[in-house]
Design a protein with these regions (language model features):
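Conserved GTP-binding G-domain of TRAFAC-class P-loop NTPases and closely related GTPase folds
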Residues: 83-194
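Generic surface-pattern signal
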Residues: 8-11, 29, 69, 122, ...
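Nucleotide-state-sensitive switch-loop elements of NTP-binding domains
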Residues: 1-14
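Conserved acidic residues
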Residues: 14, 72-73, 117-118
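P-loop NTPase motor core
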Residues: 23-111
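Walker B catalytic acidic pair
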Residues: 20
């Protein structure tokens, strides 16, 4: 309902923030179960419930894209979780940060979100490691700064379609120029070919 309201009244806000997309996924699952009179998503049998989630989540992203198309910025926040990642051609596994979506739905909904967005930023606390002894054999982490990573890394997913540097300070000023550029560019509505 909120998306439809903003679409009908695009001057009501410049940005719509969904905090968080993992909770939106839970609401999506509850909506699907209530619509089909099911107690849980697995009650559909043969994985059909997860297909419904993927389809409904795709419809949500389509509705959000309609807002983007009329000049409203859409921001999706998400929690992250560490998962063990193992590549067949590598020796051993390593930890990797991923979107925290449902255990059985993440393989379908996470790619939809990642493909849809223009910016996928990974926020982290960058610590500084210093030697604590004269020989430089003992180290400790101290201080640090909050940063946003804008490009893919083995330890996290990130992307940007705006040419941002690999790492930027966790501050609106780091990405403000993207939104200012979008506000200045006129919205063009191409004439359909007859």
């Amino acid at each position: 309902n909120q998306i439809a309201f903003v679409k009908s009244n695009p001057t009501v806000c410049k940005s719509l923030v969904i905090d968080t997309i993992d909770w939106a996924e839970r609401l999506c699952i509850e909506h699907i179960c209530a619509s089909h009179n099911k107690k849980g998503i697995e009650d559909f049998g043969y994985g059909n419930g997860y297909t419904y989630v993927s389809e409904e989540f795709g419809r949500l992203l389509n509705r959000l894209q309609e807002l983007v198309d009329i000049g409203v910025n859409v921001v999706l926040t998400a929690h992250a979780q560490i998962k063990k990642f193992e590549q067949p051609d590598e020796m051993g596994a390593y930890d990797r940060w991923e979107l925290k979506l449902g255990k059985k739905t993440t393989s379908q909904t996470a790619p939809l979100v990642k493909e849809w967005c223009d910016l996928l930023l990974f926020c982290n606390y960058k610590t500084h490691v210093v030697a604590t002894d004269d020989k430089g054999k003992k180290h400790k982490a101290q201080g640090g700064t909050r940063v946003m990573y804008t490009e893919h890394h083995p330890a996290w997913d990130a992307k940007n379609r705006h040419g941002l540097p690999f790492e930027v300070p966790l501050a609106y000023g780091s990405i403000a120029h993207i939104f200012e550029r979008q506000e200045q560019s006129p919205q063009s509505n191409p004439t359909p070919v007859q």
